From Swiss-Prot:
The gene is rpmH. This is Large ribosomal subunit protein bL34. GO terms for cellular component: ribonucleoprotein complex; ribosome. One of its GO terms (molecular function) is structural constituent of ribosome. PROSITE patterns: RIBOSOMAL_L34. Keywords: Ribonucleoprotein, Ribosomal protein. It comes from Clavibacter michiganensis subsp. michiganensis (strain NCPPB 382). It holds the Pfam family Ribosomal_L34.
Amino acid sequence: MSKRTFQPNNRKKAKKHGFRLRMRTRAGRAILAARRGKGRTELSA
């Protein structure tokens, strides 16, 4: 039997997909700008 692959961890999630990580790179800032333009209420994890 294989284990469940999703083992939730908020700290790991924030480190990989968080707002501060997005702000760090130019590409990340572009992602946030695109999500703002689309009207997302949640910009990042």
